[in-house]
Amino acid sequence: MKVSAVLKNARVSAQKARLVADLIRGKSVEQALNTLTFTPKKSAVLMKKVLESAIANAEHNEGADIDTLKVATVYVDKGPSLKRFTARAKGRGNRIEKQTCHITLVVGN
């Protein structure tokens, strides 16, 4: 039994979110929650939210036992980027791309 949760358009770059995803891949759900709680990164907060959602989905929809759940797969895909402009010298402007990503997390036993 595999249950997933997805967070789309998270306002963090995919490269930075993958650093946190690598920390929890393959761990038990309880270990992953502890790891994410004490990881001082913005993407850790987002990843914890997705993990808690996946746990709730497994418990409510499938009636799964939380103690046996593991993080089966977690991957981060690049999302659409927000284009912004910042003022530069002599009336010019530079484009700034604010990156987003899609976080997909699957738990199972």
Curated annotation (Swiss-Prot):
Belongs to the universal ribosomal protein uL22 family. Gene3D superfamilies: Ribosomal protein L22/L17. The keyword RNA-binding applies. PROSITE patterns: RIBOSOMAL_L22 (PS00464). The lineage of its organism: Bacteria, Pseudomonadati, Pseudomonadota, Betaproteobacteria, Neisseriales. Keywords: Ribonucleoprotein, Ribosomal protein, RNA-binding, rRNA-binding. CDD domains: Ribosomal_L22. HAMAP family: Ribosomal_uL22_B (MF_01331_B). The keyword Cell membrane does not apply. GO terms for molecular function: rRNA binding; structural constituent of ribosome. This is Large ribosomal subunit protein uL22. This protein binds specifically to 23S rRNA; its binding is stimulated by other ribosomal proteins, e.g. L4, L17, and L20. It is important during the early stages of 50S assembly. It makes multiple contacts with different domains of the 23S rRNA in the assembled 50S subunit and ribosome. The globular domain of the protein is located near the polypeptide exit tunnel on the outside of the subunit, while an extended beta-hairpin is found that lines the wall of the exit tunnel in the center of the 70S ribosome. Coiled coil: none annotated. Part of the 50S ribosomal subunit. GO terms for biological process: translation. It holds the Pfam family Ribosomal_L22. One of its GO terms (cellular component) is cytosolic large ribosomal subunit.
